[in-house]
Amino acid sequence: MPDFFPFPLLIGVVMLAILLAILWRRKRSPSHLFCFSVFWAYLLLVLRETLFPIPFLGGMDGMRTMQQATFVLSHVNFLPFKYFAFHNKYVVFREIALNILLTLPLGFGVSFIARLKSRGFLWLAFAAGLVIEIAQLVISLGIGGVYRTVDITDVILNAAGVLLGYGLFRIFARLYLAVTRRFGIEQHGLLACVHDVVSNAGSWRSAS
């Protein structure tokens, strides 16, 4: 079965170049551009792991037939942790770990790109996995077959990953400030960018 894989990496690199040019014109610092590039690379990796490759099932002609759409929808799982009962402990642990690790960098790193209040992280945690699962469902409907399992469990675990990443960021922020103040480390370049982000972390929380 051939795979429908429209050069997502190339498209992502082109989009990154355009966004960096826009940010540069808006006088963003080189450190911010670096953080943005790393975060963008992470997002491309997430897309690669969750959506690609897309199997090509004889023509991408919309929602296909009603029978195929019904078949796809019948394989959507809305019962949390339903399939865990059918696997051994190793498989269950692996699935939990991978789903959490997938979005953990999102919860940790998004603060270097945008300023979110604590409430915003709750919305981000919910949206992260939901967007991925909806995209998988739409693609499955479009190709007329189940190519990825759409499961509410993944949404829950992805949300947990975002919140865990945010918690680790909060810990990192406090440790970073404590260490730099204790040893009088000067903040220049990338360190200055990091210091600015972690210094403002407390104000985002209090404003929530």
Place the predicted regions along the sequence by residue:
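Bulky hydrophobic segments
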Residues: 1-147, 163-208
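Individual transmembrane alpha-helices with interfacial aromatic-anchor signatures
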Residues: 149-160
